[in-house]
Amino acid sequence: MSGNTDMPKSDTPPVVFIVDDDPDIRSSLSRALRLRGHTVESFENADAFLERYDSSMFGCLILDQGLPGMTGLELQRHMNNQGIPLPIIFITGHGGVPESVQAIKGGAIDFLEKPFRQTELIERINAALEAAKTQRKSESRKKDARARFERLTPREREIVDHMLRNPSEASSKGIARALDISPRTVDHHRARILEKLLVNSVAELIDLALRLDEAPTTDV
């Protein structure tokens, strides 16, 4: 049994998505990013981006606010409604304070006005990609934890719930009293629980549960 609960690293590289109707900006920015080793995909409008994007992709989005058709802010709202988690950096040639405030409230990590220094934008992109990698790792760890808990039987889950809600009564005798079963039966279930969850101790079990916010708040 292994106590190592880290997920394996994904080989999928992050993607910098660029959505801007200006072909010169798309071309120059794509070239600069590729020279720095980034994977880049660019689109002239929001519909083309949405047609290409799927949930297996991660990275960040460089988004022009003044797009024809669906605007940048409208695309941001659509992404939020659909649960698309890409960090967004807005770029605009005619944005004002209301637009920038709306974008930031919607979850954008930055709002730059054209003309911008390319080096400044690339710095923001690098920060956004680091945030995306951290988020992806967190989601992978949560998915892994959820899959482990789904292996438990209803009785095993009942025992785990008791252990999380009542850590001071997490001994075999304490659980046996609470659930009206024998300590020997509890010992058998505990061994199976640790095996299924791939943990070596109750402390590791609690750490795994916290990834899913599974640990209930005890009453004071």
Locate predicted features.
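Conserved acidic segment of CheY-like receiver
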Residues: 12-25, 29-33, 46, 61, ...
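Active-site beta3 strand of CheY-like receiver
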Residues: 56-63, 67
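Helix-turn-helix DNA-binding segment
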Residues: 146-184
